[in-house]
């Protein structure tokens, strides 16, 4: 269903652009330094928009069907043609370089550190989109490395950093308190999210012990979200 593909891909693009925009606003404030290169930020956006347009046209008209480089891959959420994926990687590298140089040249805080960790790991996980093995079980394992570890891992780190920044600016609460909450939320997200990937491995051909690991750690995945909600209420 092309409409569904465009809908779900639009959601991902919307969130990623939101993360990019938040980082470009948040990092200079926290680092007390201007963005390393505004020109690179515009270049990154142009590549991202061009890639998005290419995806829409490819999906709508089913262009280059079956082509290794130019055709869509038919894998949910990561259907993009390889040339678009390569463009996404280039845009991500430009973004990470720009943000990292800004942080390194300025003031380092827990907020910028956790944000950078989330953004770097998010980008590295996307590299699994280039791995498309013939074995369906292996394909699903690599697929979940992206889909699950984005939602239940890296995105939580980015969201927690943004939330901490907002609480700091809106409530005037002590930075030390905010940073303690942030570290707790980040630790919970990584602890529950990484091994919680196992709940996607139940019936795809992986060893049986993943049923136990997935079941146990999946039950903790709600904790970081609850912690973020509690953090907001306590701070306000």
PLM regions with names:
Residues 45-52, 118-122, 149, 153, ...:
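Alpha-helical transmembrane spans of integral membrane proteins, capturing the lipid-embedded, hydrophobic core
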Residues 24-30, 100-104, 166-171, 232-236:
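C-terminal ends of transmembrane helices
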Residues 88, 123-129, 149-160, 218-222:
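Hydrophobic, membrane-embedded alpha-helices of multi-pass small-molecule transporters
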Residues 32-49, 108-119, 172-188:
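Membrane-interfacial loop-to-transmembrane alpha-helix junctions, especially the N-terminal start
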Residues 14-28, 154-170:
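Membrane-interfacial alpha-helical segments at the cytosolic side of multi-pass membrane proteins
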Residues 2-103, 130-134, 193-217:
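Membrane-interface helix-loop-helix modules in multi-pass inner-membrane proteins
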Residues 143, 147, 160-236:
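Membrane-embedded translocation segments of transport machinery
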Residues 110-128, 144-146:
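Aromatic- and glycine-enriched pocket-lining scaffold segments that form the walls
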């Amino acid at each position: 269903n092309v409409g569904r593909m465009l809908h779900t891909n639009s959601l991902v693009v919307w969130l990623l652009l939101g993360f990019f925009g938040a980082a470009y606003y948040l990092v200079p404030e926290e680092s007390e330094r201007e963005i390393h290169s505004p020109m690179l930020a515009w270049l990154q956006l142009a590549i991202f928009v061009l890639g998005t347009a290419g995806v829409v046209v490819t999906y709508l008209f089913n262009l280059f069907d079956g082509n290794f480089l130019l055709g869509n891959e038919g894998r949910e959420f990561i259907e993009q043609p390889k040339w678009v994926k390569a463009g996404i990687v280039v845009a991500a590298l430009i973004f990470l370089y720009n943000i990292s140089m800004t942080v390194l040249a300025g003031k380092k805080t827990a907020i910028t550190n956790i944000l950078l960790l989330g953004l770097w790991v998010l980008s590295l996980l996307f590299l699994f989109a280039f791995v498309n093995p013939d074995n369906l079980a292996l394909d699903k394992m690599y697929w979940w490395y992206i889909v699950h570890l984005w939602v239940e891992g890296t995105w939580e780190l980015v969201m927690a950093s943004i939330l901490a920044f907002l609480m700091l600016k809106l409530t005037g609460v002590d930075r030390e308190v905010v940073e303690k909450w942030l570290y707790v939320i980040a630790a919970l997200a990584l602890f529950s999210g990484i091994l919680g990937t196992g709940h996607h491995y139940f019936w795809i051909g992986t060893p049986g012990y993943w049923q136990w690991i997935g079941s146990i750690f999946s039950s903790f995945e709600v904790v970081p979200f609850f912690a973020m909600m509690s953090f907001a209420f306590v701070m306000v």
